Amino acid sequence: MAAQCVTKVELNVSCNNLLDADVTSKSDPLCVLFLNTSGHQWYEVERTERIKNSLNPKFSKTFVIDYYFEVVQKLKFGIYDIDNKTIELSDDDFLGECEVTLGQIVSSKKLTRPLVLKNGKPAGKGSITISAEEIKDNRVVLFEMEARKLDNKDLFGKSDPYLEFHKQTSDGHWLMVHRTEVIKNNLNPMWKPFKISLNSLCYGDMDKTIKVECYDYDNDGSHDLIGTFQTTMTKLKEASRSSPVEYECINEKKRQKKKSYKNSGVISVKHCEITVECTFLDYIMGGCQLNFTVGVDFTGSNGDPSSPDSLHYISPNGVNEYLTAIWSVGLVIQDYDADKMFPAFGFGAQVPPQWQVSHEFPMNFNPSNPYCNGIQGIVEAYRTCLPQIRLYGPTNFSPIINHVARFAAAATQQQTASQYFVLLIITDGVITDLDETRQAIVNAAKLPMSIIIVGVGGADFSAMEFLDGDGGSLRAPSGEVAIRDIVQFVPFRQFQNAPKEALAQCVLAEIPQQVVGYFNTYKLLPPKNPAVK
């Protein structure tokens, strides 16, 4: 029997007194959460943001986990000093880790442990604190904020201000829950609109005190406090564009030193609105279908399928990396598609009878009906197709992305959150049409669509990591920025010794938030939502 999710738990992470791995400055730490479902293999679930030049980081990005009462959920929090832009952690300095169960965290509510090395021995210094909160509320607060006449903290140029929001815990401590972007060189900044869950902001209590701090960002990590104010949601929600709610930004040290001190600037809340966001399960249970499409790389670099060295070689027990990826992801996602008919395409091969190179040919060779019956149908189409084509090239992604995008665009005519499209591309190597693919992804980001790329074999996948917008927004050659991150890339080699479900859990981890993010952005409700009627 499948485990029933009792509730969702939000984990907030901070560290103290970390090892200093950088010679000329302090470490730039981030926290990686790993999960263990099988007993031996750990797989990565999510990462916090990287905090520059800090040995005592407080991460604003939280981890949200389904809490299962009847399952021992093993978690590992790894702390790394990040000095480059690659996704791999092997080339970053490891500062220590902490293994713990979710049950231990929730029963403690706040757990502090010393960091240990991979061999289990103490890291020498550094501790991690994990705070747990149950998420009971899907209300979010939308903010528009600006400031004027902020103090200038910089000798050359002007301050680079950003805001931090803090809520007060039951024991009186302040916990940071949101950090805005930095506005460079500006004493009258206008921050981008942002949202914070009401639970994160004030536990859903409209009269709970909220502290807002304004800082001047410094590259060396020694951010200067410009000033602070305290308020409540009751006061904040009075704000409107015609009548903003304004707060004096007060620096207590300056006020005590200077009798004539008035303030360090004024922070203006132009808009503060509470709205309810549907959850992923609200959409799924409300009738949203996930449409799954597979794209398989049949380029020559895979090697002759009849040779055991080929990535397309099917072993005597009937598997290869392509088939494993199809099974792993497909078995999870098929439950969210009512008819279980999945289109499957190949690209980069010469196809009969003309032997022209195609980058979106149906693996069942039926252009009018490229659908396969279930995941088994995709596997059978792949096996049947392989001996009938000639592996060729180049490795072009954009045709198949644009193909699925056309269906996603048609679905937007329905005005409800009725369909979402997930494209799985399995590839062995370096992408050829990078500019066209970047443009295709930027276009697809405006549609109900996500792209999963699984890299098989041992090739250099740096271009794929570039498409996965985790390090910042992807741009089209035109300069247009993707409005959301829709690409998830993982190299298959990370999962070669993992249980079969680990790959799917990793690549599908971001899908729920991408689904919710899209439908919330366009204010689309589930088809069966009572509010629609």
Curated annotation (Swiss-Prot):
Compartments where found: Nucleus; Cytoplasm; Cell membrane; Cell junction
Entry keyword Cell membrane: yes
Annotated binding of Ca(2+) 1, by residue: D22, D28, D81, D83
Coiled coil: none
GO biological-process terms attached to the record: cellular response to calcium ion; cellular response to growth factor stimulus; ERBB2 signaling pathway; positive regulation of cell migration
UniProt entry keywords in alphabetical sequence: Calcium, Cell junction, Cell membrane, Cytoplasm, Membrane, Metal-binding, Nucleus, Phosphoprotein, Repeat
Similarity remark: Belongs to the copine family.
Protein name from the UniProt record: Copine-3
Gene symbol of the encoding locus: Cpne3
